[in-house]
Every structure is written in structure tokens, then in C-alpha cells.
Amino acid sequence: MSQSDPLNVVSRILNKISKDNFQVLIDQLVSKCQLLDKNESTLFINNIFEKVVEEPSSSSYYIQIINKIQPIFQQNFSIGVGNKLVENFNKRYQILTDQINSNEETFDFNSSKQSFLNLCKFMGECYYTLPSSFLVDVVNNHLPQVTKETADDMTLQQLMEIEIIATSFTSAGKTIESMGGFSSKHENNKTHNNNNNNNNHDHDDDDHDEEDNENNYENTTSTTNNINNNNIQSRENDLHFKGIQKALEDATSVLSFLIENRQLLPPRVRFMVKNLFELKNNKWIIPKAINDDLNAQREVVKVATNHGKTISKSLSEKCDDDSTLNTIFWKSFFQALGIQNYKILRQLMLDDKSNISPSSTSPTIPLSPFLRRSMNITSPSQFNLNNCNNNNNSININNNNMDIDASFDLNDGLMESSSNNNNSNSQLQFSLSSSSGIKDNHNVPTIDLNTISSNNNQQINLPSGFLSPKVARSNSPSLSSVVKQPQSQQNNNNNNNNNNNNTTITTTTSSNNNINNNNNNNNNNKIKESPELSSAPDSNLSVIVSIIDSKIWTPQKEIWKKKIMNKIIPMKSILKKPQKIEILAAIWQNMCDNNYEYGSYLDLCLNLIKMDEGDISPLYSLDGGNVPPVKPYQQSAQPPPPPPSSSSSSAQQPPNEPVNPLLNKLKGPNRRSSMATLQMKPSGISEARRSSISVPFELNRRGSLSGDIPSYCPPAPKLKSTPTLKSTPAIVQNGGSITSTSSSSSSSSSSSSSTTKNIHPTSESKKQPIAKKHKPDLDSFKDVLISSLQDDFALKMFVKKRSLTTYMELLKDLYREFIIEIPLLLKCISLVHNGLYELTDEECTMLFDLEEMAQEQQNLEKQNDQQQNLLTQNNQIFQWKTNTWEEKPQTPPPPPTSYFDLGSDVFVL
């Protein structure tokens, strides 16, 4: 059989059929089937039947193929596809009965029976292509002749035959029910054709033209032929369905007798027969409950098919490091396949807000801090204001417990509450983030209740000068010199009959506050506390987030940053990746809300990155900044030798001087604070950041961007054998003095001996243990920032805050500060493009400029790499002594390997 043989081609197409390519391959299959001859057509039908036996789950595809090729084979070769299928069906049954009677040890009865029952289901589903006597023959051939005497001795084969009848009639039941509709349809066709015939005869009486008479005669003959054919077909169908109904009634009498005696049939077979009777009595319509379940599952599959690729893609991108989130999602998906949970599933998949407020019955999925901060209520922690008096849908808040600055007066925007419960007109005039519908018309700062802890009796020392409702105002000193005295130390608020409280806000109160809340029945809207905040050591992370969320006062910016850094530095080794993401999300959220303080929040991000690299500024120290700043040259340069006239006491170092380990490293010259660039005038090109593309020598860390030979060459590397001042051992004599040369005087030798008394010998330093290799922190702030930019969680927060311009400015500044590189910058730009967000003209302009700058820088880096590769290919080396590029010298010829070398003309004796 050649490869171009039509049967071979059709068989290969049949083997390739799957769910994805079925619609494409079935057209090719039908077109190739027209090229088959009679024998090949028979072989092809046999191949389809064998495919059904091997792959019963794909029987629906083969049924459609049979319906397509049946008229082709019938017209070309007068081959009935149904007859061939029935022949193969009977052969398969004969093989099965022979195996049962042979009693072979290797024969598996259960698997063979299940395979044949799947074949019966297939034959019932493609009933239209089968001969009309198929079901009648099934009843006559497989109905066991059971009587009262022989009923107790039913064999496995007889039980299998009962299952064959039940399976065949169950799958072909809708066709049997179509008998009534079929007959009515033919009656309608009869009346319709009779009306047409009468109209044609009327038309003959009115019209006397010969041509019309001829046409009408032809029409009448054709219609009468159609009527006769339809009548013959309807009679055959009536006889056919009557025969099926009679055979089914005969089978019903036997099967009902077997059902009445419970001991005769196994439970599974008995319920199968009962299901057949229920379908017959219900006109072969599936019961409503089962039908609804099937329809619901079909709709679930349809929705999952439409959204499956998007879900799988998003899960693979966002659940790489979190396997529990992926498990929870698919577990909730498969649990929701029932009817009751289907609406929850559909809402979870189709509603845009499904990831914000998951239902209480479904498992709680941890949200990203960026998504949590982009919600309507942006607090990552639970809050509850117990001193709210809500009677008759009114809100009253007492502010007696808060100590407020004179410059920060809240009394303009806050109404004092009265203890009278009948006062139903009191109002709340300050805004509670975006969740409150009450607007504040006064131009005063508002309290941000976004990050309030859920611990009621927790007392935390807040940094001085920052208003945060996490604790009472009296616990923290104020910025201004004029401070209001606390009004009352005890608040006795009796809140009774509060039945309509829909929003509950909790603040930490002091131990003197006595609050009684009775009959609070409808407290609905509560937000769970962030797991990152609750698991923080000593709850200092909550304080840090509160300081970040607090308002920045212009004269106190440095104090604001200093307080945050002094809280984070002691927790540097304890902070984990989720807690760092929480801090970063708080910074970026406030960067969106307070665009005028963008530079302060950006500088805070850079300071956190420098802290992990040990490049922290001296202003942020562990003791609150009391350590004086250390100049750079004092760290790197060696101390100069003392003059001869200096005393020995001047050379001594003060004992027990506190040393900050974070101040050992200097501030890198290649990274400059963005605040200095924003607040100061732009300096020269050599002192600028990575802000211009045309500067050839600004990026000495990344290499030159110009095409010329670099004018600046790095210093020569130190060799291991090069002696240095530190590694040269001092020659110590018996008196503890260094041996002086013959030209040195006695005064200089005495002074040098006095100075060396306090110097530790190098032998002691050699005995110290070697420091372990520093393992890089995989969860540093820089890595957390990069990973946060790689997905679209942070981008969605900027989009919901309508601060895409801030997002693009942040990307540009992070690139200038050597924190992100060109590939990540291009990926962030592609996330904006793929999100299909509605951008303003300004945002579109900034996005195009950013993309153009990234592409240009990428091209320059490629050119630089090509030039470096070209230099290495030209065999040029740099001479450190002359500071010039020279050609690499040729390697000397090898020594002669024999007694006579023609290349060297030298005889070796």
C-alpha cells in the first residue's frame, strides 16, 4: 500500500482526529472518501468500528463521521453503512460469547463486558444510520427466556444480555419517542401537499393557456409522486416503530418480573432497568434534576473552555512561588461543579471584583498587597471604632482621646457627639479613605485610617511628630511646641440598641476607656488582617506601615525618613519577602496618592536598597543619628604616621568607641540619590545620573557608550605577591622597637618605638579565623522590587489609582539609578500594552518616550558589546606601564623536536 493510496490517506487522517482539529479534518476526510472504491469503503467502515472499540470516549466524533459518509457510500456503491456496523456488532458479540464459554483463565469478563456495553451505547446513538430491525433483533436475540423455575439459575451471560437491552434502548430512546412527532409531521406534509395540489387545480381552471397547463400537469405529477413516496415512508416508519414498541413491551413483561424479585438481579442491573422504565414513562426525557445538572456541567465546561487559557496563563505567571494558591483555586473550581455552587463559580470567574471579596464559604485566597491596597477599603488590617454611637442610622464619634497639634485641628471637620441616643442628625464630616461616602469640604488634612492594627490593647511607641490613629495621640509627642492637653482620660459611652451597624471601625483604646456595646447584630463589613502584618516581629511592621501612610510635613521630611529607617534597620535580618512586599506596596500606594511628594518616596525606596547593600547613609544609624557622620577618606585611607614631636598619648585610640557596622561601607560613586538631583540644579555631565544617552563617559560601571577607544583605563590589578604596607611584617626587637637604619637618629627611633607599642603584631591578625563567605540575600529589597515589577499586580494598583504617569516616572528613575535593566524595562512596557488600558494623551506620550529611550539604550549596549568583541578579535592588549593599546606579540616558535629542523636551520648535536 503506497503512501498516496486513498485508503492509507483516509486512515492517517482518522488516526489524527482529536478535539482540537476535528472540524478541520472531517472535511478532508469526507473529500478523500469520495476517491475510495467499494472494497476500500468496506475496510474504512471496519476501521471506524475498531476505533470505537478502542476509544469509546471519542465515539461522538465517529458518529458524526458516519453521518457524513453514509450518503456518499450509499450513492456510489449502494453500501449501507448501518448494515456493515450491524455485521461487525454481531461478530463482536459472537467472539465475546465464545470467550465466555471457553472458560479461559486469562479472559477478563468485566473489561470485555464493559467494552461491549460501550459499543451498544454507540450503536444506539447512531440509530438513524442502522437498519430498522436493529432494536427488534436486539430484543429477540438478547432477551433471556426466564420463567419462575429457571429464574434462580441466571448465568453471567444472561445478566449481560439484560444490560445490553437496557443500554441500547436508553441511548436510542429519543428516536423511539419521535414516532408520534414523526407521524404528525407526515400528516402535516400530507395536508400541505394536498393544499398545493388544490391550488394548482384552481389555477388550471382559471388559466387557459397551454403552457400553464403543461407546467401545472408536471407539478401535479411531481407532487403526487412525492405524496406517494411520503405515504410509503410514513407507513414503513409506523410499522417500524410499532414493531419496536411491541418488542419493548415484550421485554418489559420479563424485566418487570425480574425487578419484582429482588434476589434475581444484582442492585446495579436492577437500577439500570428501573432507569429504563422511568425514561419510557417520561417519554424518554431526562428528569429535570439530572437535566439541570447536565446543563450546568455543560455550561461550566463552556465557560472553562473560553477562559481556560487565560486562567492557566495567569496562574502559571503568578503562582510560580506559591503552590498553595494554585491548589486552592483548582480545588474550589472542581468543588463548584454542582448545581448549588455553580453560580458562585460563575461569579468567581466572570466578575471583575471576584478577587477582591471572596465569599465566606469558599477558601480564603491570600491577596497580593498591591491588590489589597487598590481595593475600595485599602486597609491591610482589620479596624473597628468602638466609640461609634449609631442609633437610627446615625454615626457619632468622640474625639476626646486624641491629642492633636495646634496646626492640625480636626475639630473643624469632626462633630462632637452627644450622649443622647435620640439625636439622629449628627454627622461625620471627615473622610474615611475611599470607603466612606461622606465628603469633607474643609481644607484640612484628613486622617488616613488605612493601616490600623487590630490589637485593641497594644501600646506601641510611635515616632514623634506623626499622627496615626493606631494608638492614642497622648502616647507620642508632637512636632510643634504648642500641644493641646488631653481633655478627658475616661470615655464612658453606652451604645445600646445598635441594630443597623453596617461598617465597624476599631481603634486601639487605652486601659481607662470603658466601652459597652450591646445588641450589635448586623456588623457585616469587616476586612481580615494582613498575614504579613500579624506575623511581623513585635508588630514593628505595623508601625512602619503607619509611618509610611502618615502625612509628610515639608520641614520634617528627613525626620520622617530617619524614623522609618531606624525602625527597619534593626529588623533587617528578620524581614521576609512578604513583609518587604508589604512595605514596598505602602510606599508605592502613597506615591500614587501624594504625587507632590514623589521624590521623598522614591528616595525611601533607594535607601532601603542601599541598606541591603551596606551602602546606608550615616544619617540613619541605630542610635537615632547621634553618631557623627564619617568622612569617606577616613575609612579607606591608611592613618598617616605621627610626627616625631607628638606624644604617645596622642596616638592612642579612645577605648570602647561605638562602631556602627552599617557605616563600614561607603556610598558608591555611581549611584546618586534622586532627591539631590530633584532639589538641586542640574550639574555637569560628569556628575549626572544615567539621564542622557549621548554622554560617552557617564556610565563607567556599564562601560563606555561611545565608539572611541576608552580614555579612562582601570588601574592595574594587584598581584598576590605584591607586598603592601599591611602585609609587611614589622621586625620587633627585644625592647619592642622597630630596627632603624643607620641613617635614622635616636630621637626618631625612640618615637617610632613608642608608637609601635600600641600596634598589634601581624601574627595575631593571622591567627584570627577567616570570615565566612557572604551569601547573597535572595530576598533583598532590590530583588523584591524587581519581582514586583515583573508581574502586573503593582501595575494594576497604579492603574486603579490613575497614576500611570507616576508608574512610568518610577521606571525611568529606577533605570537611571542602576536598579533595573533594559529587559525588565521593556517587559514593564509590554505589560502596559497587553493590559489594554485606557490611556490619556499624556500617558501615551510618556509611554512612547520611555519605549523609545529603552530601545535606543538597548541598541547602544549591543553596539558596545560588538566593539568589545572587535577589540578582542584584533589581538589588542592594554599595556599598564605605558597606558596604551598595543598589538599582542606573536608567540615564539617552539624549540626543535628533532636533530635537524629545516625551519630553524640548526643542527642539534
Curated annotation (Swiss-Prot):
Coiled-coil positions: 845-877
Chain segments annotated as transmembrane: none
Domain called MIF4G: residue spans: 7-283
Compositional bias annotation for Low complexity: 216-231, 417-436, 491-525, 739-756
Region (Disordered): 178-232, 415-439, 460-537, 627-689, 704-774
Acidic residues bias: start-end ranges: 204-215
GO biological process: anatomical structure morphogenesis; cellular response to differentiation-inducing factor 1; chemotaxis; negative regulation of sorocarp stalk cell differentiation; sorocarp development; sporulation resulting in formation of a cellular spore
GO molecular function annotation: RNA binding
Phenotype of gene-disrupted mutants: Null cells are arrested at the tight mound stage but accumulate the bright yellow pigment characteristic of mature sori. Although these mutant strains do not form fruiting bodies, many of the cells encapsulate within the mounds. Sporulation occurs about 6 hours earlier, accompanied by precocious expression of a prespore gene, spiA. However, the spores are defective and lose viability over a period of several hours. Unencapsulated cells also die unless they are dissociated from the mounds and shaken in suspension.
Name recorded for this polypeptide: Yellow mounds protein A
Species whose genome carries this gene: Dictyostelium discoideum (Social amoeba)
